[in-house]
From Swiss-Prot:
Name by which UniProt lists this protein: Epoxide hydrolase EphH
EC code: 3.3.2.10
Source organism per UniProt: Mycobacterium tuberculosis (strain ATCC 25618 / H37Rv)
SUPFAM superfamilies per UniProt: alpha/beta-Hydrolases
Active-site residues annotated for this sequence: 28 (nucleophile), 156 (charge relay system), 186 (charge relay system)
Annotated gene: ephH
Enzyme class, UniProt record, top EC level: hydrolase
Length: 214
């Protein structure tokens, strides 16, 4: 399992729909896949929200991210063993939301239950870590040929903007958009769904004025 394999899967889905290109949006690993799909010529525009992959093969920041996910392995094991009962443990909400939201209250009970269920049934977790360890991150960003929007999250503990934005800002062509969202963590759709929706739709409307007109 790798970002390339995930991009292959999305390409097959696009082919099944009969879509040569589309406006592609992704968060975290999904942001990495979004830029990979752009490199393959499948994007009309690309929006990466707290995107992963912002490193070279030997960047210290890459190993920092991998170390964070390895450190989270015990929590993953508890979720796998206990399932929803893991949420009854002391500090479970705090620990479960650290990589996701700025505050523990940023995720609802229903959403947190879904997160625990996903974590308990994710066989690709360690496969992705191994692939990330041996492979470079996003390459050829300087050749990005469509409008691109990088959205960073101020309270992101997984890829903090202060250390993880440089690969994008240095590599993407002039004219790309960079937005920093205040007060949200790595998965801002939980804490600020309205703001994220507005960011996505307004960017697409700018790229394609006829969308707004219709």
């Amino acid at each position: 399992m790798s970002s390339a394999v995930l991009a292959d899967h999305v390409e097959r889905q696009l082919d099944e729909l009969g879509w040569e290109t589309s406006h592609i949006v992704g968060n975290s690993l999904g942001g990495w896949v979004a830029f990979e799909l752009e490199r393959r010529g499948r994007a009309r525009s690309v929006t990466g929200i707290a995107p992963a992959g912002g490193w070279t093969r030997w960047s210290p920041v890459k190993f920092e991210v991998i170390a964070k996910f390895i450190a989270g392995a015990p929590i993953l094991a508890v979720a796998h063993i206990l399932g929803q009962r893991a949420l009854r443990l002391p500090f479970s909400r705090l620990l479960a939301t650290l990589p996701i939201s700025a505050t523990p209250d940023g995720v609802s009970e229903r959403e947190l239950s879904g997160i625990i269920d996903d974590a308990a049934h994710c066989p690709a977790y360690f496969q992705l870590l191994v692939k990330a360890l041996v492979l470079p991150g996003l390459q050829e960003l300087e050749h990005t040929a469509v409008p691109s929007h990088v959205v960073l999250c101020e309270q992101d503990r997984v890829v903090p903007p202060s250390r993880f934005s440089r690969h994008f800002t240095d590599s993407l062509p002039a004219g790309h958009r960079l937005t920093v969202l205040d007060g949200v963590g790595h998965v801002p759709m939980f804490e600020a769904p309205g703001r994220i929706t507005e960011l996505i739709t307004s960017f697409i409307e700018e790229c394609c004025p006829h969308v707004r007109a219709s």
